[in-house]
């Protein structure tokens, strides 16, 4: 099968398309998936460049990729038919740092705890965009912040991968959402449900907002320090 692999840490020039990658072996608690689409995130190039090698050293050759969508071809021992079965359309994470075989391949193995059934209304491409950013946004809003109905939250970088998902999830939780974006992205985040949109290039958000319950900062730097003023 084909896969995108690296044989050493480095920038994009170390990535190779291997036409003869062995099909990944299936073990207990995992599923084998025929990949239909895969998502690309900043963490993928960070892994490729060795940014996580102290915590998660790769064994080369290593198949890249985390987010995916596809169809289950085989289930391992310990996977109940009530959870997943052959033919199920799923999406989730198959990165090697989370026990998978790498999503940038025609076939991938993923932990059953790292996947979910794909909603019928989502295409494979749409579903493959969601896992990493969706989990990150959901954990911050529900576990770290415990955001609830009628609370006010400022989300920095609302047009980005995590920010755009965070806006939608925060609105589904009943929160009032303000966000910072560039002027050209204002229509996009308004469509997502943002109640207040601030152009970060021309408007000082800390002078416009006050008494907010939470700030979700996906930007960092000086934005982080200035954000304390709105709480």
Q: Which ranges hold each PLM region?
A:
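Residues at the starts of beta-strands that form the adenosine-phosphate
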Residues: 2, 89, 175-177
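Glycine-rich beta-strand-centered segment in the early N-terminal region that forms part
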Residues: 22-39, 52-96
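NAD(P)H dinucleotide-binding glycine-rich loop of Rossmann-like/cofactor-binding domains
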Residues: 79, 93-157
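Short, well-ordered loop/turn sites that connect or cap secondary structure elements
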Residues: 83-85, 147, 231
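Local beta-strand N-terminus motif with an aromatic residue
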Residues: 87, 105, 150, 194, ...
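Mid-domain Rossmann-like dinucleotide-binding core that forms the NAD(H)/NADP(H) cofactor-binding site
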Residues: 128-201
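Glycine-rich cofactor phosphate-binding loops and adjacent beta1-alpha1 units
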Residues: 178, 192-231
